[in-house]
A protein has these predicted regions:
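HIT superfamily nucleotide-processing domains
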Residues: 1-113
């Protein structure tokens, strides 16, 4: 499998990690769209949100959200932040390994674009 994020998990590609545990890694986005912009990804390869299993991945999905919230607060986003997940081409997904973008420390607008 030639998955960019799996290669980051394996340590084959460097990333500026801000957090890691046995289930997830969080690292700064290479093209930040806000003063704070990091990704939270599972170590387990799951290509899209359609591939999540309620039976097997419910705890992992919850852990990703809690990790995003905790790290956003640690990075000074107490006034608010945005969490974005894209799914498939029409949803804007470009890396087929689920991931959350967490953006903060600036005013967010709607619609996003």
């Amino acid at each position: 499998m030639d998955c960019l994020f799996c290669r980051i998990v394996a340590g084959d590609i460097p990333a500026h990690k801000v957090y890691e545990d046995d289930q997830v890694i969080a690292f700064n986005d290479i093209a930040p769209q806000a003063p704070v912009h990091f990704l939270v990804i599972p170590k387990k390869h799951i290509a899209t949100l359609h591939d999540l299993s309620e039976k097997d991945d419910k705890e992992l999905a919850g852990h990703m959200l809690i990790t995003a919230q905790r790290l956003a607060e640690q990075q000074g986003c107490q006034d608010g932040f945005r969490v974005v997940m894209n799914c498939n081409d029409q949803g804007g997904q470009t890396v087929y390994h689920i991931h959350m973008h967490v953006l903060g420390q600036r005013q967010m607008h709607w619609p996003p674009g």
